[in-house]
């Protein structure tokens, strides 16, 4: 399975404390209409940390049902509890997801050997394509390129990484050690174009919740060799990328989507609404970009 191009890390819309299935299905449709290359339910942007297990499963199921095979679905299924990660990954496979996005265990801060054994154990229970998610700013642990290379060698299910350090030296080492067939996706919207330039294959994006066509255009232009267009789009969406991180993700992106009329603005604690000053800044940025 090739996960290439622009994938959106979908928000999970809520209404009155429950998953808003109608708005979620509409978001999936809009993303596909806008030319997105793939979708990721139940990632960080989807507030997976505050979904119940049943909601987590429901969101994956709804996404797969609505996509109907038109684009790949890479389902968030990670946990810092290996047994729980096995359960969620098994459900993702049963629901028909094309692959699983598995975050490195967080809070318990395993060693590199512990990280290796975690993913090996999941693969032994649920053989399906995995993209490992490395985001040290949230997990407190960095998955080293050498460990990824060992996983790639020993665990066939590990076919790539979502690399969110923003560190192009580390990205380059991953590609050097793992080879060109290892799928390296940006987990940092600011460095999509540089990551593609050193051999990456795409992005799992927050910003593409708001500008799916632009993020898809950036990736497509790069792969078609149209570097001028890729560079132009990179700078066109720079202000959007900054806006999506005015406060902790997914607070700004859900606020933006509510301003666009696509979802109700509802977050789950401990996420709280965007500060008023940042709401004004966000609206100004979206207005300048012609989005609202």
Swiss-Prot record:
The answer to whether keyword Transferase applies is no
**UniProt-listed Pfam families:** DHDPS
Which EC number(s) does the record attach to this protein?
A: 4.3.3.7
> What Gene Ontology cellular-component terms does the record carry?
cytosol
Signal peptide range equals none
Residues that coordinate or bind pyruvate = 45, 204
Which terms are listed as keywords in the entry?
A: Amino-acid biosynthesis, Cytoplasm, Diaminopimelate biosynthesis, Lyase, Lysine biosynthesis, Schiff base
- Residues forming the catalytic site: 133, 162
Q: In which pathway does it act?
A: Amino-acid biosynthesis; L-lysine biosynthesis via DAP pathway; (S)-tetrahydrodipicolinate from L-aspartate: step 3/4
Q: Which domain of life is it from?
A: Bacteria
Q: Where in the cell is it found?
A: Cytoplasm
UniProt main location, coarse: cytoplasm
Task: Please explain the role this protein plays, according to its UniProt record.
Answer: Catalyzes the condensation of (S)-aspartate-beta-semialdehyde [(S)-ASA] and pyruvate to 4-hydroxy-tetrahydrodipicolinate (HTPA).
Tell me its family: Belongs to the DapA family.
Subunit structure comment from the entry: Homotetramer; dimer of dimers.
Question: Protein name, please?
Answer: 4-hydroxy-tetrahydrodipicolinate synthase
